[in-house]
Amino acid sequence: MSEIPAELYYTDEHEWVLRTGDDTLRVGITDYAQAALGDVVFVQLPDVGAELTSGESFGEVESTKSVSDLYAPVSAKVLAVNGNLEASPDLVNSDPYGEGWLVDLQLDADDMEAALGGLLDADGYRGVVTE
């Protein structure tokens, strides 16, 4: 069974979201997603400062099996990208909830609760992966 940490939020598209501050979030792909992808060989991420729209593609994860789009869990600005993935894309496999994070996002603090409210909790995501 895939690891699904209770403190994170999730999307139907297998991204996880961690609230890191009043107006900031960290995003990655779930353990379930990395296992389904297989060995990750390349990660394409947006530029810092890019504006992401909830539900729209913001990058790609390429594995030995396939190429999968990454979808923005919320509408926000890219604050940082994980530069370590350029040389070590396999971090997505070995540590999807830690060193394998993808992007840090910033949104208006007033919009945070509504944005997180649109995401799944661990139990909701568990329902998605066991269907």
Curated annotation (Swiss-Prot):
Cofactor note: Binds 1 lipoyl cofactor covalently.
Positions bearing N6-lipoyllysine: 65
Coiled-coil regions, chain positions: none
Cofactor: (R)-lipoate
Keyword line: Lipoyl
Any one biological process term the GO annotation gives: glycine decarboxylation via glycine cleavage system
GO cellular component terms, A-Z: cytosol; glycine cleavage complex
Domain Lipoyl-binding: 24-106
Pfam families reported for this sequence: GCV_H (PF01597)
Function comment: The glycine cleavage system catalyzes the degradation of glycine. The H protein shuttles the methylamine group of glycine from the P protein to the T protein.
HAMAP family linked to this entry: GcvH
Subunit and interaction comment: The glycine cleavage system is composed of four proteins: P, T, L and H.
Family from the record: Belongs to the GcvH family.
Protein name (Swiss-Prot/TrEMBL): Glycine cleavage system H protein
Lineage: Bacteria, Bacillati, Actinomycetota, Actinomycetes, Mycobacteriales
